[in-house]
């Protein structure tokens, strides 16, 4: 794994609707917590919640960000997200196109 790759991360979160997804994406990018957020509409989630199997249409966020912003990014996402327990998973980046990784890492520039 390259040093640049280990300095960036991809985060996964799901939102109940487009308005929420756009609001979170806009805030994370505007506040320099993420370099890019891709909104994937049309996801169907099946999960267990409070003893029941639930189904929901959701919008998935793929958040690309420097690893150093994670604590602030998590705090901000939790402030903006309407779910009691929002999904927020950090996926390790083991490699990628070097120029793209450098761009992700330089979110503050």
PLM feature spans:
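Positively charged, small/polar-rich N-terminal and surface patches that mediate targeting and assembly
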Residues: 1-109
């Amino acid at each position: 794994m390259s040093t640049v790759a280990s300095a960036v991360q991809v985060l996964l979160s799901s939102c109940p609707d487009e308005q929420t997804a756009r609001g979170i994406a806009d805030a994370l990018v505007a506040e320099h917590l993420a370099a890019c957020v891709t909104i994937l509409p049309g996801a169907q989630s099946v999960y267990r919640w409070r003893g029941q199997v639930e189904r929901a249409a959701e919008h998935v966020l793929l958040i690309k960000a420097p690893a150093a912003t994670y604590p602030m990014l998590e705090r901000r996402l939790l402030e903006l997200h309407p779910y009691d327990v929002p999904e927020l998973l950090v996926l390790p980046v083991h490699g990628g196109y070097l120029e793209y990784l450098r761009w992700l890492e330089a979110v503050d520039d």
